[in-house]
Structures are given as structure tokens and as C-alpha cells.
Amino acid sequence: MIHSKKLTLGICLVLLIILIGGCIIMTKINSRNAQIKDTFNQTLNVYPTKNLDDFYDKEGFRDQEFDKRDKGTWIINSGMYIQLKGGALKSRAMVLYINRNTRTAKGYFLISETTEDKKGYVHNKDKKYPVKMERNRIIPTKPITDEKLKKEIENFKFFVQYGNFKDFKDYKDGDISYNPNVPSYSAKYQLNNDDYNVQQLRKRYDISTKRAPELKLRGSGDLKGSSVGSKELEFNFVRNKEENVYFSDGINFKPTEEMNHEQN
């Protein structure tokens, strides 16, 4: 009888330890997930910034990678990627480097086509058109004979100029993951076609599918902040081996010297 009571007590203690351990683990996971969501929210707070000139006065995260005299450079990029069944992956995107030291901004508009041959080799065809930004206007810096393309470039709007994530904190049922080895982290949320950002993308791009997209946020580097890491987001309407329809966007703040090397 005594032995039976001791055995029962022992089992109860083991179960209690497991329960407490499980609660501690879940608390840590929930805390980390909240931290990841908060990290993304800090980046998404810059949406919308309708006037790109405002980035000259926006301060980003600074760490030991920055020279004390360096005000830093913002890198913003937006692009639409479409691959119909059996076709090439075609994209039209723009990248802009906004130098806070010189208060100048330059970049390029990129038209890209990616195909895969029968042997599995990938082939890329890229065409870059250099641009600059002045008074919130995109201006080609080299002559463009194609008037339609010229207008497309001049009228280009980055997602940060019209996107809005004011309700991001209310997003629920997200799939949040974290890899401490890289470190990297991500969050995925299924959207609906009534979402403001989805409506804005459909208004500006020829998106053939009626399928509502999944919003995927990706980040790398220290969760507390790092100029070494990066943050990007995607609206994935269709993603598979045969067909792709997605929109990609990124805003990052980097040391200017590092960006000068990247542009050269």
C-alpha cells in the first residue's frame, strides 16, 4: 500500500515537472513570437511614406557597423514577378539607394526574364535602366526611346508609398518561425481579397488569379536589431514549380560605404 502511494506520488511529480517544463517552453515560444512580430511591426511602421524625400530625414537602426559620421543609406525595392504555366518568370522591379549624407538618391529599373532549359540550366536576361529621384519623382538618367517604358519608369511607385500596415498588430493565426543558427525568422499570414494592400496591388498590376495571397515576412540578423541583417516581404498569390505570381518588397538601412561597394 505504501509502495503504491509512493509510486503514485512519483508519477504525479514527474507529470507536474513535465507540465511545468511544457509551460515554460510555451511561454518562451510565445514571448519570442511576440518579439518577432514586434520586430516586423517596427519596419512596417514606415508604410506608407508617400514622399520618398522624407527618407533623407528618417533615422534607421544603427550599430557598431556604422561610422559615427555616416548618416546611412536607405535601400528600397519593389517588384512584381509573374510566371504563367510553361512560360518564363518575368519581373519588373525598381531599386533605389537613398543616401542621407549627400541627400541624393539613385538606382535602377530592372526588367528580368528567367528561363530553364531541358537540362535544368537556368538562364537570366536582365536589362537595367539607371534612374535618380528628385523631389519625389523618378527620372531616367539615360535616354529611353521606348516612350511607353519611359512613362512606366517615371510613374513607378514603390510599395512603401502606398502600402499600409496599421492593422498589423491585429493579424492573427500567423505561422511564425525562428532559426537561431542563422539567425533568421519569418511570419506568414493568409490574407483575403478585401485587404487594403491586396486591393492596391490588384489596382496597379495585372494579376490574373483571383486567389487571395499569403503575406510572408522574412528577416535575418539579431531580433533586437542589426545592420547586417535584412527584412523583406512578399505577397504570394501563386507559388509552385509551374506557375508564380508574387509581389516582393524590401526596406533596409545600411552603412553608406557598404552600399557604395554594392552599387559599383
UniProtKB/Swiss-Prot annotation:
Top-level taxon of origin: Bacteria
Broad class of where this protein is predominantly found: membrane
InterPro entries tied to this protein: Csa, Csa_sf
Lipid group attachment sites (S-diacylglycerol cysteine): C23
Keywords: Cell membrane, Lipoprotein, Membrane, Palmitate, Signal
Signal sequence region: 1-22
Localization (cell): Cell membrane
Bilayer disposition of the protein: Lipid-anchor
Coiled coil: none
Any one GO cellular component localisation term in the record: plasma membrane
Entry-linked Gene3D superfamilies: 2.50.20.40
Residues carrying lipid (N-palmitoyl cysteine): C23
Family assignment from sequence similarity: Belongs to the staphylococcal tandem lipoprotein family.
Name of this chain's protein: Uncharacterized lipoprotein SA2273
